[in-house]
Amino acid sequence: MKKTLRFAAVVSSLAAASALLAAAPAAAQALGSQGAQLADEVVAVVNNDVITGRELDQRAGLIARRLQQQNAPVPPTDQLRAQVLNQMVLERIQVQKAKDDGIRIDDATVQSTLQRLAQANGMTLEQYRGRLEAQGVPWSVFTSDARTELMLSKLREREVDGKITVSDAEVANYIASQRGPNASQQQDLRFQHIFIKAPTNAPQADIEAAQKKADALLQQAKSGADFEKLAKNNSEANDAKKGGDLGFKAPSALPADVVDAASKLRPGQVNPTLIRVPDGFEIVRLVDRRQSQGATAAAPKIVQTHVRHILLRVGEGKSEGQARQQLADIRNQVEAGGDFAKFARTYSQDGSASQGGDLGWISPGETVPEFERAMNNLQDGQISQPIRTEYGYHLIQVLSRREAEGSVQQQMDIARQAIGQRKAEQAYADWLRELRDSSYVQYKIGGVGPAN
């Protein structure tokens, strides 16, 4: 059942979008009367198109709700509105470019994507549509968003990703740099950090404001302020609640500028200058050093999962509903103390049935995306709900996980993917900036600057 297959990023984007759309009405209320006053006004002209206040209200509401769900600080309304409008401008420019280039997404492709998304959630398309509509998400809106995501994905593939190449020499250099010339003597580093977001493609005014904020925080940190409190109250990274503590990391897992800073710092010291990273500004404090575990400690690692499953195929006298229900019944019996392996040997239609459904240790990329995503969402010992893949319906149980140094080929694959992703992100940012510079954009509300 093992099969290498890349998971389309558009499916993940739509999965996140479905949750945001469901929350839109409640979030929009938080924007107050200002949004209502702008609802029918034009807030931006983008080439020969316009963005209305109503569209801006809806999108800003989604973003505000998403931040609330993540327990992240929500910017003031004017600031949020400006940031969201700039995002919408960039999106609109790309949609126009795609249409001008003749990129079209037919209904069959949209339906296929939605079907795959529904299957990844263990539902039929009708059930998935029903769930979204019950949450207040109009199906027509979700379908339209799916078409836009697919269009922009195809545009990026044509203009950027499809032109990225990674040579064997780059792969070899990457792996060598991960290990380092004296890997056995390398030290793992523990940092605290404060991250202030400022993507390179953000408006220049936003970048300058972010740098000013970061500079002020840096001065406080250098003056002896409690770094942990500063991080908790100001950092925009996911680890802000932990005081920005990154834990011990090998130098290879940290940005090069951060590693360079460590060479000049003693534990407890704050780096005297800001560190510019692609997404913003970093303030870092070296907490501690420790001896690494040797040459292999810095080598690319993979997380392997020991997993077993029960597969029921659809079609051979068994409908979709029957397969799901049978697996749901088996799951209930296993949760009540039944023997998973025994059920697998009796009912599974996979070649692993004779081993009690045991697939052994699975490395990333060795299963179909829907299976891997469900597997990755499980804790050790946990059993999934019935999951649909191209093979049928699965009941998945994770037995344990381990971290291992991959084979030479796996290390090469990891290196190639990391290099390609880094090059693609930079190329995309450059391409998007050029596209924006060649477009006509006029803002109709105050407090918004051009998205340089």
UniProtKB/Swiss-Prot annotation:
Localization in the cell: Periplasm
GO biological process: Gram-negative-bacterium-type cell outer membrane assembly; protein folding; protein stabilization
A single GO cellular-component term on record: outer membrane-bounded periplasmic space
Keyword Ion transport (UniProt): no
Keyword set, alphabetical order: Chaperone, Isomerase, Periplasm, Repeat, Rotamase, Signal
UniProt catalytic activity: [protein]-peptidylproline (omega=180) = [protein]-peptidylproline (omega=0)
Keyword Isomerase: yes
Enzyme Commission no: 5.2.1.8
Signal peptide start-end: 1-28
Sequence ranges assigned to domain PpiC in this UniProt record: 186-288, 302-400
Gene Ontology molecular function, alphabetical: peptide binding; peptidyl-prolyl cis-trans isomerase activity; unfolded protein binding
Function comment: Chaperone involved in the correct folding and assembly of outer membrane proteins. Recognizes specific patterns of aromatic residues and the orientation of their side chains, which are found more frequently in integral outer membrane proteins. May act in both early periplasmic and late outer membrane-associated steps of protein maturation.
Domain free text: The PPIase activity resides only in the second parvulin domain. The N-terminal region and the C-terminal tail are necessary and sufficient for the chaperone activity of SurA. The PPIase activity is dispensable for SurA to function as a chaperone. The N-terminal region and the C-terminal tail are also required for porin recognition.
Descriptive protein name: Chaperone SurA
Organism: Burkholderia lata (strain ATCC 17760 / DSM 23089 / LMG 22485 / NCIMB 9086 / R18194 / 383)
Lineage: Bacteria, Pseudomonadati, Pseudomonadota, Betaproteobacteria, Burkholderiales
